[in-house]
Amino acid sequence: MKLAYFSSLLPLALAAPASVVDPREPKEDITDRYLFSTPLPTFLEYREKENPDSLDWTSDGCTHASNNPFGFPFEPACQRHDFGYRNYQAQTRFESDSRYRIDLNFYNDMIFQCTDVSALRSCHGLADVYYAGVRMFGGFAKRDEMGAVVASATDPKESAEDLIAVYYTALQEYHQAVKADQADGLLPRL
């Protein structure tokens, strides 16, 4: 009898929304929970349902990122990164410390996305390049009169020269990883 009763509740449980948001919960708390405490696959379910609709779910994906010729699955990480930047900006709390946390979460999401990739060295290498790129250009980039990015107004502890050096080192290491993965037959030669 009990089994039949609980079995009849199963369709209702499966049809329930992925997340029930208390309408009294501040947007800032929801944003932080979705960014820093929610597994990426669960975040993507919330994003698909735009739950709650009071948050900014828009994303341009990885459009400003470096080339991804092997199609590493970074799009979900880029979507959550955009969610973080856009909502923190809308909530007027986008500053160097929060930006660092959002960027670090982006890096961790990319590493998670590499889990099922056979060319793990190259996937991790490109994650390093993307992370260095957002640290250098993300959020606070300054532009000259022609619209070109000239520097990044970042945390004073991160000089533009250091960020550029980290970016180019990551790029070099990525190219080395690609060559190694190609030699091992894990990536095609382009």
UniProtKB/Swiss-Prot annotation:
Expression triggers: Expression is dramatically induced in the presence of insect hemolymph as well as by lipids. In addition, is also up-regulated in cultures containing insect cuticle and under conditions of nutrient starvation.
UniProt note: pH dependence: Optimum pH is 7.0-11.0.
Residue numbers annotated as active site: H81
GO molecular function annotations of the record: metal ion binding; phospholipase A2 activity
E.C. no: 3.1.1.4
Residues annotated to bind Ca(2+): A65, D82
Keywords: Calcium, Disulfide bond, Hydrolase, Lipid degradation, Lipid droplet, Lipid metabolism, Metal-binding, Secreted, Signal, Virulence
Root EC class: hydrolase
Subcellular location: Lipid droplet; Secreted
Cysteine disulfide links: C62-C78
Signal peptide coordinates: 1-15
Phenotype seen when the gene is deleted: Decreases the ability to penetrate the host cuticle and impairs the repression of host immunity genes.
Cofactor: Ca(2+)
GO biological process, one term: lipid catabolic process
Any one GO cellular component localisation term in the record: lipid droplet
Regions annotated as coiled coil: none
Cofactor note: Binds 1 Ca(2+) ion per subunit.
Function statement: Secretory phospholipase that catalyzes the calcium-dependent hydrolysis of the 2-acyl groups in 3-sn-phosphoglycerides. Increases the ability to utilize insect-derived nutrients and lipids, and promotes lipid dropplets accumulation. Plays a role in virulence, including more efficient penetration of the insect cuticle and evasion of host immune response by repressing the expression of host immunity genes.
Protein family per UniProt: Belongs to the phospholipase A2 family.
Xref: PANTHER family: PROTEIN TRANSPORT PROTEIN SEC39, SECRETED PROTEIN
Protein name per Swiss-Prot or TrEMBL: Secretory phospholipase A2
Organism: Beauveria bassiana (strain ARSEF 2860) (White muscardine disease fungus)
Gene: PLA2
